[in-house]
């Protein structure tokens, strides 16, 4: 990332994620960008298959693209909630690992960190 290019983040959502966790990650980025008057950050929201993801409060969230179509990104951040064990499918985790290969940052929010630890 050059000093003038924005930091681009990809948030990978899993069913059962917390809206509050996602908003707590994105809103400070938005505020910093808006208050600075510069495009410091950009982000996209993804799911494994590109379909809508249902939050823990039962809100269906449309995503920008499926994980396989995520291109250049500075960080891949997994966001999952209480049902994280259901996401521990071999194919799903292999897809995440393939996409994460070579990325500068791989992170997890809420139980997304737990998924990464396994």
Tell what function each PLM region has.
Residues 110:
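Aromatic-residue-lined binding/catalytic grooves and analogous aromatic/hydrophobic interfacial grooves
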Residues 1-106, 115-118:
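Extended, subdomain-level signal for the structured scaffold at the beginning of enzyme domains
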């Amino acid at each position: 990332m050059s000093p003038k290019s924005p930091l681009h983040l990809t948030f990978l959502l899993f069913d059962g994620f917390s809206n509050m966790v996602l908003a707590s990650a994105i809103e400070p980025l938005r505020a910093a960008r808006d208050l600075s008057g510069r495009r410091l950050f950009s982000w996209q929201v993804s799911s494994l298959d590109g379909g809508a993801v249902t939050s823990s409060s039962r809100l269906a969230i449309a995503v920008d693209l499926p994980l396989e179509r995520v291109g250049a990104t500075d960080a891949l951040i997994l966001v999952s909630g209480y049902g994280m064990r259901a996401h521990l499918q071999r194919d799903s985790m292999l897809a995440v690992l393939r996409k994460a290969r070579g990325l500068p940052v791989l992170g997890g929010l809420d139980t997304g960190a737990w998924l990464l630890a396994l």
